Structures are given as structure tokens and as C-alpha cells.
Amino acid sequence: MTATLLQLGPVAGERPAQAIVDGLGLGLAEGVVNGRPRVAAAMIASADGRATVSGTSVGLGHPADRALLRELRTAVDAILVGTGTLRAEGYAHLLDDDQRERRIARGLDPEPIVATIARRGDVPVEVPLFREPGARIQVYTEAEPPPVDGCAAEVMVHRFAAGGATPAAVLAHLAAERGVRSVLCEGGPTLLRALVAGACVDDVLLTLAPLFAAGDGPAVLEGAPLDPPRRLRLSDLHRAGDHLFLHYAAAT
């Protein structure tokens, strides 16, 4: 039997980052499904599957990738990110003035909530985002956190019992207590794996960088093998230069 493949590109026509993200409908999500918001996971990888180069994702990126990320942030109610990623990437300004104004016009707060899970109480208050007066940060922990009173950002700490600060519990809390309908997870690899393992990811936005990285850096997902592996359904594909931008939906 001869296998056949469908050629997807190159395809004529260009779409701006805003139009691509608008097509996902993240900003139109209403209510919650199975007690949690709709979750989109944004990730970037080298051609050999590494999520970082020299400790961060910066060396893998492309201007179009960064534009897509900011548009995704513009669309959602909240961002979920691990403390390690907050530190490594030095989170600061999330959006520009135009994106904030577009959120306000849609009846949203100027910037999305940023939620992070710090089970051991290691809240990264040194990250520039904690010094942003307009930032709203939700911290979920299972230990005694450091003081956050000196942060310019609005920081709320939620302490769970041991083993309770799971991604699923955090998503449920964001939906029930903060009215969050859509979440963008920006990693890192351990958090992404936990979300996938818990069937808490609806959309995957994967940027594939035209690089071989090798080394011992993390893969896009890190942790124990998923048994069985989780299947995805390709929904869309875009290209900028030699970078590929793939949108997958979780298979049902």
C-alpha cells in the first residue's frame, strides 16, 4: 500500500498575528467546561525538541512568535506560568498600550491575571513583573510564602494543603473566584506536562524553530512518560521565514 501525504505549503497569503489569535476565539470563551476555563498552551521548541537555548527560550524565537504570544495574552483572562519560567525569562511588561486599550474595549481588565504555582513558597518577588503597578498576580502555594507587601503589583497568595496546589485546582479556583474563562499557559515544561496529564489543555500553539540545540536543556514537556501518549489534532499551520507555527486541538 502506497502512503500519500498532503502538501500544506508554501501557501499564498499573509495573516497578521491578531487575526490568527482572533480566529481561535479565546476571548469569546463563555463559562467553564468541567469546572475549569478553556486552556491554551503556548510552547516553542527547536527542531530536535529542546525548549531552551542557554537557559531561556529567547534564542529560539522569531518576531512573529513574540507577536503571537502578545496577542494571545491580549485575548485571555489569565496567564498561568511556572515560577522557574518567571525567573528565567524575567517577566516584565506583558502588553503594549494598544493591546491594553483593545482589552478595555472588550470589557476586560487592562492586563490579564498572572497565576503561578510556588508549592514550596519560593515566590519570585525579584522578578520585574512584581514591581509593575498594573500587574495582578495570583500565587498558589503549599508552604509559608515570603512577604509580598512591598510589591508594587497586586499580589494575592492562596495557600493550599500539602499536595493541593495542582494545576487542576488552580484552574478551578481561577474560574470560581476570579471569573476566569480562558487561560494561556506559558510553561515551563514541568507545568505543561502536568496540565496535559490532567487533560487540562484544549489548544496547543507550538512554534517550531529551525535550529538544532542538543545539550541537556529541557524538552517541551518534562516528567514521567504519558501513558498512553496524548493525541492532538492539527487545526492550523502558519510560517514566518523558516519558523513554523502550529495550532493543535486536543483530540476528543
For the regions a language model picked out, list residue spans one by one.
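Enzymes that bind and transform nitrogen-containing heteroaromatic metabolites
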Residues: 1-252
